[in-house]
């Protein structure tokens, strides 16, 4: 049997919102497999569908830059939020974003070797900034997207670059509408553009979880299947952008809103600073002690 560490319990709590003892029991029952533990909690009705997005860890900025038919979204990390608000750091982020577009680098490693017009490499420029700012800085990731003259980019930054979205709308040049959709994606955080992108494996997995959940609720077997399909449709609506109620007008879906502009959402990239990165341990030991009193 796997050892259930406090760190593992904490991670499960962050992903599900379930209580500490429920999380510990779920991990014990599933031999420490966190994904199975999430399903266990959901089947027992203890936790809602986990988005499986890890706690925000590192600081830094997300930035979106567009040039004609090309656009890039980039995340650059710093150690503290104080530095992320530094004007010099913000300028560095813009420089790097423009360098990605100018060089069409495909990986972070390749980008670091590219040179600016002054002959200085990106790697050298970042080391120079580290020396000036006094913190470790790093280019974490970026994504380039393209469009044609009949399409539009939607660029949106939330909380000064804490969250950034780059959306691609096909068939419409209405940049304001595309930006509104990018804002929706920043707020609601869908996983996919549409249900067509959801794998059969994920759908079948969700269907099985919902079935067990319904049976555990004591629902009669003859209505379970109908109930599961209804809940599955709701689940897909929650994770697919085009099917969601548009944040600026909940009376219509994102798809319907864009249709009034002659457009269609075909792609998006959403970055949130530090997502998926390890967060410092904070007060969890104190919380455990409190539970023992």
From Swiss-Prot:
GO terms for cellular component: cytoplasm. The lineage of its organism: Bacteria, Bacillati, Bacillota, Bacilli, Bacillales. GO terms for molecular function: translation elongation factor activity. It comes from the Bacteria. Pfam families: EF_TS. Its main location: cytoplasm. Associates with the EF-Tu.GDP complex and induces the exchange of GDP to GTP. It remains bound to the aminoacyl-tRNA.EF-Tu.GTP complex up to the GTP hydrolysis stage on the ribosome. It is found in: Cytoplasm. This is Elongation factor Ts. Keywords: Cytoplasm, Elongation factor, Protein biosynthesis. The keyword GTP-binding does not apply. The keyword Cytoplasm applies. Residues 80-83 are annotated as: Involved in Mg(2+) ion dislocation from EF-Tu. The gene is tsf. Gene3D superfamilies: 1.10.286.20, DNA helicase RuvA subunit, C-terminal domain, Elongation factor Ts, dimerisation domain. Signal peptide: none annotated. Belongs to the EF-Ts family. InterPro entries: EF-Ts_dimer_sf, Transl_elong_EFTs/EF1B, Transl_elong_EFTs/EF1B_dimer, Transl_elong_Ts_CS, UBA-like_sf.
């Amino acid at each position: 049997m796997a050892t259930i560490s406090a760190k593992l319990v904490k991670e499960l709590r962050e992903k599900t919102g379930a209580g500490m003892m429920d999380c510990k029991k779920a991990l014990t029952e599933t031999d420490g497999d966190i994904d199975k533990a999430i399903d266990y909690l959901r089947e027992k009705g203890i936790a809602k569908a986990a988005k499986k997005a890890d706690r925000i860890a590192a600081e830094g900025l997300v930035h979106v830059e567009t040039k004609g038919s090309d656009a890039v979204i980039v995340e650059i990390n710093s150690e503290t939020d104080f530095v992320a608000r530094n004007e010099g750091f913000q300028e560095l982020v813009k420089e790097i974003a423009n360098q990605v577009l100018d060089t069409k680098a495909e990986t972070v490693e390749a980008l670091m070797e590219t040179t600016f017009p002054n002959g200085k490499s990106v790697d050298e420029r970042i080391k120079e900034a580290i020396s000036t700012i006094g913190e470790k800085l790093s280019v974490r990731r970026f994504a380039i997207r393209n469009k044609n003259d009949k399409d539009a980019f939607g660029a949106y930054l939330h909380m000064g670059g804490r969250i950034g979205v780059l959306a691609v709308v096909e068939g419409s040049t209405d940049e304001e509408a595309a930006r509104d959709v990018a804002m929706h994606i920043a707020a609601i955080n869908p996983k996919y553009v549409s249900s067509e992108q959801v794998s059969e494996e994920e759908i079948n997995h969700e269907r099985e979880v919902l079935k067990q959940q319904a049976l555990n609720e004591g629902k009669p077997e003859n209505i379970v299947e109908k109930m599961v399909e209804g809940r599955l449709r709701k689940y897909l609506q929650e994770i697919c952008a085009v099917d969601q109620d548009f944040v600026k007008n909940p009376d219509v879906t994102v798809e319907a809103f864009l249709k009034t502009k002659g457009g269609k959402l075909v792609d998006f990239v959403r970055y949130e600073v530090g997502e998926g990165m390890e967060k410092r341990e904070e007060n969890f030991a104190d919380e455990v002690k409190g539970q023992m009193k």
